[in-house]
Amino acid sequence: MKVDINAIKELRDLTGAGVGDCKDALTSCNGDIEKAKTYLREQGIAKAYKKSNKDVSDGLVAICIDGNKGAILEVNSETDFVARNEKFQKLVLNLAFLANQYGIENIEDFLKCEYANNTNINDEIMSNIAVIGENIHLNKIGCLSVSSGVVCGYIHNPIVDNLGKVGAIVALESNCDVEKLKIFARQIAMHIVATKPEALSLDVLDQNVIDKERDIIKKQVEQLNKPASVLEKIIDGRMAKFYQEVVLMNQMFIMDSQFTVSELIKKKEEELGSSINIVDYKLFIINK
């Protein structure tokens, strides 16, 4: 049958599939656009599963913030070329929005959630794999919320708003002025992206990380031929410096190196007249 060029254009606009694929679909479905959409979806998903085992080494990080809750996620692609594809970017931003709406960090559970028009998130990703032509992998999700306070985020060198290669969200609990708290929270998020801490506070830093670093330092100072009591003080001093590098609350604040983050919070509490607590943060870096 002869396929109407306008039908091909409409189907292409609806699905993002190529002209040839749209023509084949309409031919197979006797010009019925709805059936052709289903046909393309079935064919596309079959192609997508073949692509879904390819390595992914690029991608984007997206954030979505809504007052006292926020989400961050990392979606991987095979190449930077696709990471700069407008359709891929729209997908990633939509996924961040849904992650914030659902508040689900578990990937398997999130993929089962509704996307739109009775499709689930996994189906939408597979559909995009078929259209874009590269594997797409949802790598991780982070969600934060507070009952009183704010969640803020920061993307370094954004490609478009809320989308880039490195990003962070942080949750601050406080009863102080919300707008002033937002400014401070964004500064903390920027600090996190710049310094890349491994833990919020010393009490949640992995004990294995602590033990490994202490063992390394111990072996380094053994060669100094000092009394044991002196060596122990040297070890403690170097460990304190290590904590200042990897623990957020112990780090020197990048915008005012006179203060650690912990000291700055106390200063802000006095300034804003209310206690401030960093509940948690999430830092995502492509392929790290």
UniProtKB/Swiss-Prot annotation:
Stated name of the protein: Elongation factor Ts
UniProt-annotated location(s): Cytoplasm
Gene name of the encoded protein: tsf
Domain of life: Bacteria
Record HAMAP family: EF_Ts
GO molecular function, one term: translation elongation factor activity
Annotated Gene Ontology cellular component terms: cytoplasm
Function per UniProt: Associates with the EF-Tu.GDP complex and induces the exchange of GDP to GTP. It remains bound to the aminoacyl-tRNA.EF-Tu.GTP complex up to the GTP hydrolysis stage on the ribosome.
Keywords: Cytoplasm, Elongation factor, Protein biosynthesis
Organism of origin: Ehrlichia ruminantium (strain Welgevonden)
Residues covered by region (Involved in Mg(2+) ion dislocation from EF-Tu): 79-82
Entry similarity comment: Belongs to the EF-Ts family.
